């Protein structure tokens, strides 16, 4: 059996290659050398990912880091922090390019998850409470796209909305992503949210079912394009397994509780970050 996410990932890249349109004119994103980072994009895409078993949703066509994405997940959702130094101490450098003078990323990501919601301590506490006490609700959501605070964020959120639904003791997660860097961001994000889905299911005594992922603008940057096309046409491998150790509560979760077993992958590929 091949890894499920490999096929989904190749379908995404193929869709952009076949139907996408290259950006023109001025673009916000730049490479470290100051060159404009143009991209080929496709608007409006959805995929569904079965997260019901112990398959780790890591691509196998190249090495996909697992530790740094989980540390970022922990920083945003459990620590509910926006302090880049705290993330660095965890061994993750994802946000170094966007660190503001006060050492934070402003009112973004963990700052918004930490906001009190309907009398609950945070958005995550609200989700957990509703799933346990009111599982039939269609209002179990988190949102970190806050219009009147966007100007105070180092970077506006890419993945910004989650919605959680229970049907027959099975937990479904829907994710909404406004902007998707396919070579780098998507690979980390899908793994992160597959783990979050499992953690919330464990906390609430539910079975994880599908993740429904909605992307508005998915794109491949010009300096990524040829390498990514080559990458997704490589041989892929049997999926790794994921194990969550020492689970007591989602609020006691630590990054080292995640164990990845038998991860096989192709030759490593490096991609420049577009800032």
Curated annotation (Swiss-Prot):
Binding site for (6R)-5,10-methylene-5,6,7,8-tetrahydrofolate: 181, 274
Pathway note: Pyrimidine metabolism; dTTP biosynthesis
Active site (record annotation): 158
Domain of life: Bacteria
CDD domains: TS_Pyrimidine_HMase (cd00351)
Binding-site residues, dUMP: 138-139, 178-181, 189, 219-221
GO process terms (BP): dTMP biosynthetic process; dTTP biosynthetic process; methylation
Any one of the GO CC terms: cytosol
Alphabetic keyword roster: Cytoplasm, Methyltransferase, Nucleotide biosynthesis, Transferase
EC number(s) given by UniProt: 2.1.1.45
Compartment annotation: Cytoplasm
Keyword Metal-binding annotated: no
Protein family per UniProt: Belongs to the thymidylate synthase family. Bacterial-type ThyA subfamily.
Subunit structure: Homodimer.
Role played: Catalyzes the reductive methylation of 2'-deoxyuridine-5'-monophosphate (dUMP) to 2'-deoxythymidine-5'-monophosphate (dTMP) while utilizing 5,10-methylenetetrahydrofolate (mTHF) as the methyl donor and reductant in the reaction, yielding dihydrofolate (DHF) as a by-product. This enzymatic reaction provides an intracellular de novo source of dTMP, an essential precursor for DNA biosynthesis.
Protein name, as recorded: Thymidylate synthase
Organism listed in the record: Fusobacterium nucleatum subsp. nucleatum (strain ATCC 25586 / DSM 15643 / BCRC 10681 / CIP 101130 / JCM 8532 / KCTC 2640 / LMG 13131 / VPI 4355)
